[in-house]
């Protein structure tokens, strides 16, 4: 038994200069696990509750001392003495202790910090890597990175409405090669933007945030960068979009404020169909609002066989919402964010449910990150095949990529790379 002897939480800083929760779990054998909790900028209405203090005189109301106190004063006494190897039992105990459907009492940020730190402590106690502890001997698939190299929407102060324009080096044969490809395209894009006299300042997730004339210009600019880096769009590298359409949805329509255009659901679907026909786009995330279920279904019927349609705000890593999507054949992929649901157990349940239904699962960071690289281990542990964790820029993003390089190195000849097989539900 790896008995928990102490749990301690503190307030630390995330990559946007906002407070977040860090938790340490100590075991009887001297092992310790530490975890930091991420935070999102564009958040779905159905996400688990991130507890903030609301005291405007301190960190503009964004302090997390209440969540820290909940760990130290409420959760710790309940879990001390439990076996850290009983991840499900520990997570269920915290869910029951909270007693709300959305973790609104203790805070998902408090509960998740403990959940991840317990897993890290257990892995250290057993002397195995975290991905191996979580996934077992078959945890060996390195994910295709979904690299956000151009930012708009809530992730940047510019005129681009679509939140993220990403590259996916699907044609690479290893994670190391995929990361190099993405990094070379990133530097190529910086040069392309500089030659056009555009800003090369970066947004929350490390991507550039230039003022472009349209969302389509963002796509063509990235294609120029891919070619300039020596890669072939549609063969070596594909594009992925995160529209974050819920942020645009007002009064039943979608408002592209940067372009000064308003679109209906039907016009949005036609817009995506046109983009997919013109450009090598392999994935579209949150193409419609989180409550536009009929629209999502129509979008899936139209494009679901050839494009990955990822539900982030739609599914919020929640098995109940995912089950509704599966039952109605809505979307074909789930974005997995640990802090949307609040425990590792529930995160793994969502991934398993998606895979059993033939949906893909994309493991994801948040825009507010830390040096914590747990999601890298989760991606390998679940053989998810895809990870979304920003540009190859900013330490809070690169920390995840560096951990994946270490894992690939450690797995050596047994490592596999997701590549095109990561999109197992699309017709070639």
Curated annotation (Swiss-Prot):
Gene3D superfamilies: Enolase-like C-terminal domain (3.20.20.120), Enolase-like, N-terminal domain (3.30.390.10). (2R)-2-phosphoglycerate binds at residues 163, 337, 366-367, 388. It comes from Brevibacillus brevis (strain 47 / JCM 6285 / NBRC 100599). Catalyzes the reversible conversion of 2-phosphoglycerate (2-PG) into phosphoenolpyruvate (PEP). It is essential for the degradation of carbohydrates via glycolysis. PANTHER family: ENOLASE. The active site is at residues 205, 337. One of its GO terms (biological process) is glycolytic process. Mg(2+) binds at residues 242, 285, 312. SUPFAM superfamilies: Enolase C-terminal domain-like, Enolase N-terminal domain-like. The gene is eno. Keywords: Cytoplasm, Glycolysis, Lyase, Magnesium, Metal-binding, Secreted. This is Enolase.
């Amino acid at each position: 038994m790896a008995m928990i002897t102490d749990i301690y939480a503190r307030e630390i800083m995330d990559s946007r200069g906002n407070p977040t929760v860090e938790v340490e779990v100590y075991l009887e054998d001297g092992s310790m696990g530490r975890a930091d909790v991420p935070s999102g900028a564009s958040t779905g209405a159905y996400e688990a509750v991130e507890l903030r203090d609301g005291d405007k005189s301190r960190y503009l109301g964004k302090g997390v001392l209440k969540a820290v106190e909940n760990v130290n004063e409420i959760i710790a006494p309940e879990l001390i003495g439990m076996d850290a190897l009983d991840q499900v039992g520990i997570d269920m105990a915290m869910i029951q202790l909270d007693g709300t459907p959305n973790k609104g009492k203790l805070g998902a940020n408090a509960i998740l910090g403990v959940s991840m730190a317990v897993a890290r402590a257990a892995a250290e106690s057993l002397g195995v890597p975290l991905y191996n502890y979580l996934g077992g001997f078959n945890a060996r698939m390195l994910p295709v990175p979904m690299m956000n190299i151009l930012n708009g929407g809530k992730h940047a102060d510019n005129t681009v409405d679509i939140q993220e324009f990403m590259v996916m080096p699907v044609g690479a044969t290893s994670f190391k090669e995929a990361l190099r490809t993405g990094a070379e395209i990133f530097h190529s894009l910086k040069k392309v933007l500089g030659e056009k006299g555009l800003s090369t300042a970066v947004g929350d997730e490390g991507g550039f945030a230039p003022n472009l004339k349209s969302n389509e210009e963002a796509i063509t600019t990235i294609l120029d960068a891919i070619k300039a880096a020596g890669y072939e769009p549609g063969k070596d590298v594909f594009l992925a979009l995160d529209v974050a359409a819920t942020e645009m949805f007002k009064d039943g329509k979608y408002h592209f404020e940067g372009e000064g255009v308003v679109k209906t659901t039907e016009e949005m679907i036609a817009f995506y169909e046109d983009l997919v026909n013109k450009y090598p786009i392999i994935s579209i995330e949150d193409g419609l609002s989180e409550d536009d279920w009929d629209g999502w279904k129509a979008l899936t019927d139209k494009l679901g066989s050839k494009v990955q349609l990822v539900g982030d705000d739609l599914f919020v890593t929640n098995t109940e919402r995912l089950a509704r999507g599966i039952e109605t054949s809505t979307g074909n992929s789930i974005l997995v964010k640990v802090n949307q649901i609040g425990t590792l157990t529930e995160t793994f349940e969502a991934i398993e449910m998606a895979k059993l239904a033939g949906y893909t699962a994309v493991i994801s960071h948040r825009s507010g990150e830390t040096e914590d690289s747990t999601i890298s281990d989760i991606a390998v542990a679940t053989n998810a095949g895809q990870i979304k964790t920003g540009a190859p820029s900013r330490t809070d993003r690169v920390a995840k990529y560096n951990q994946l390089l270490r894992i690939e190195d450690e797995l050596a000849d047994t490592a596999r790379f997701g590549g095109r097989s990561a999109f197992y539900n699309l017709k070639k």
